[in-house]
From Swiss-Prot:
UniProt entry tagged with the keyword DNA damage: no
Gene3D superfamilies hit by this protein: Aldolase class I
Involved in proton transfer during cleavage (site feature) positions: Y141
Keyword Lyase: yes
Protein name in UniProt: Putative 4-hydroxy-2-oxoglutarate aldolase, mitochondrial
Length: 314
């Protein structure tokens, strides 16, 4: 049975495959990819995260991806489902769909479409309503970059978590190690998991008490990111730091957006998973463009060393 609180380690917010001719989900490739990631040392998968292009998917497609993931990884591998939307009602619909489709946890962005109206009382009320009605444990998702600049501070997250026992964690894509420090010092890890939202500050987060990270770069090199975590937790800090620095430099092209992340996944992890025509299938969904040839060349150049390391990991 999957624990009530998300377990420490590396979670991967998996990218989404499309049939570029019909602009529909490629579920066969998706299933193969999920299965590969689950064999790569990861603690769990996040389905419908930001890098899955969740806001570009229909409600039916969202449910299909969760169900496909559950089929691919079996009954016991942890799945967290992104359920972000603009209203409480929409979020609750997505949560119920996720529960039926086989998710274990839900990852919830704050409402933020009307930025000025999204006051602290509104945010607290939203998470109260969602957590009380959700059949699945709730993980707060703090990502100001996709939420009109709404940035939940550690005091607000603590208040929400203490009031609502069904809130069991947070993903901090705000990249604040200070928040990780305060939350880890305030909320017990048995009841609340604090995850960094990017792998390039993984060791910084672990050093102050994080549970690990939910890392888009784990789409590209899942074994490498998992190895950094493994080395650090085993007390091999120098080895962990050496690998971490290489991975952080390799990740730099992904900072330009979803297109480069998906391209990197196509030529590395999807290739390792045996998925044909992955570059075409991992183009961003319309209306967004694939990366330029210059960006592709940069990915191949900057990631070459870590690609060789990944290939040598079991």
């Amino acid at each position: 049975m999957v624990p009530r609180v998300p377990q420490p380690g590396i979670w991967c917010p998996a990218v989404t495959f499309f049939d570029s001719k019909t602009d529909t989900l490629d579920l066969a490739s998706q299933e193969r990819y999920y299965a590969y990631l689950a064999r790569s040392g990861l603690t769990g998968l996040v389905i419908l995260g930001t890098n899955a292009e969740a806001f570009l998917l229909t409600r039916e497609e969202r449910a299909q991806l969760i169900a496909t993931a559950r089929k691919a990884v079996g009954p016991d591998f942890p799945i967290m489902a992104g359920v972000g939307a603009h209203s409480t009602r929409q979020v609750l619909e997505h949560i119920n769909d996720a529960s039926v489709a086989g998710a274990n946890y839900v990852l919830v962005l704050p409402p933020a479409y009307f930025g000025k109206a999204t006051t602290p009382p509104v945010i607290k009320s939203f998470f109260d309503d969602v957590s009380c009605q959700s059949p699945l444990p709730v993980v707060i998702y703090n990502f100001p970059g996709v939420c009109n600049g709404i940035d939940l501070d550690s005091d607000m997250i603590t208040t929400i978590a203490r009031k609502n026992p069904n809130v069991v964690g947070v993903k901090l894509t705000c990249a604040s190690v200070g928040k990780i420090t305060r939350l880890a010092a305030t909320l017990p890890p048995a009841a609340f998991s604090v995850f960094g939202g990017q792998s390039d500050f993984l060791i910084g987060g672990l050093s102050v008490g994080s549970a690990g990270c939910i890392a888009a770069f784990a789409n590209v090199f899942p074994k490498t990111v998992s190895k950094i975590y493994e080395l650090y937790k085993a007390g091999k800090v120098d080895q962990a730091m050496e690998l971490h620095r290489k991975a952080a430099l390799a990740e730099s092209p992904c900072k330009s957006g979803i297109a480069t992340t998906k391209y990197a996944a196509a030529i590395f992890s999807a290739k390792a998973a045996g998925i044909e025509d992955a570059e075409e299938k991992l183009r961003p969904r319309k209306p967004y463009d694939p990366p330029s040839e210059a960006a592709k060349q940069e990915v191949r150049k900057v990631m070459a060393e870590v690609a060789a390391i990944e290939a040598g990991l079991s």
